[in-house]
Amino acid sequence: MSKYSQDVLQLLYKNKPNYISGQSIAESLNISRTAVKKVIDQLKLEGCKIDSVNHKGHLLQQLPDIWYQGIIDQYTKSSALFDFSEVYDSIDSTQLAAKKSLVGNQSSFFILSDEQTKGRGRFNKHWSSSKGQGLWMSVVLRPNVAFSMISKFNLFIALGIRDAIQHFSQDEVKVKWPNDIYIDNGKVCGFLTEMVANNDGIEAIICGIGINLTQQLENFDESIRHRATSVQLHDKNKLDRYQFLERLLQEIEKRYNQFLTLSFSEIREEYIAASNIWNRTLLFTENDKQFKGQAIDLDYDGYLIVRDEAGESHRLISADIDF
């Protein structure tokens, strides 16, 4: 990307849905109109859909499936929660990058990458993070809360992610307790919550989020094709990743504020209604111990109440669940 590409793109984005003249762009950036034209032409080659009309200017109609730092900066400038973001073309893991970036500052921020080469989920399971097909990010938040609140955070943030996906999906989106989001029988999202703590409590929550955005079925590995899906597969319109990210950040901010001010009991019924684990036999894995059973209830502290095949009850704060 050329020296002024991010700046030109930012001006085009800020002026949507209006045209902006090449002269206005040139004056804003203190460059020539010839330089502006070269940048516009290059952005078009990169996949930006820009309508250019004589005596009217340029209109950004659609962005390609690439993350641009200049556009993301617009979200953080208007956000009451996030102070900054870091955007990468490719990275080993957004979670690892977030842990490095939180050292020496007290900011809330997020890391976003177009590709992860070492993406992982809970229990260190591999998470496929292919280029241009998903939203791979880590969110760093700074709540002043006790260690025990981490499981409560999971419950609130799951609803935020679910709500963002539901906005774009024609089919019902459900939460699979505690860390997965499904559309129908396909997993569309997994998230991983970790914390950095000191003697006084939680210093930072780092929530890694992986959402399949635009994959077609053939893009998934054959071994998971029967149980994976993407948002695009349930959206009749072409999915705009920037609109999706904006909605996701709004929902995260909303649910994070609820997490800080509400008890889980106040959203318990909503969470139960949004869950897909009821009235079915499930395989539970807890601390390397496996058993089959049914989820009976979610108590007011967010623990899952399970009855196994022998009739014994279990109260789980975290476990891996397979259908």
Predicted region positions:
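Long, positively charged amphipathic alpha-helical accessory segments at protein N-termini or as interdomain linkers
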Residues: S2-I31, L45-E46, A146-M149, L155-V173, ...
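N-terminal lobe of the biotin/lipoate ligase/transferase fold
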Residues: S2-Q166, L239
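Conserved active-site carboxylates
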Residues: D180
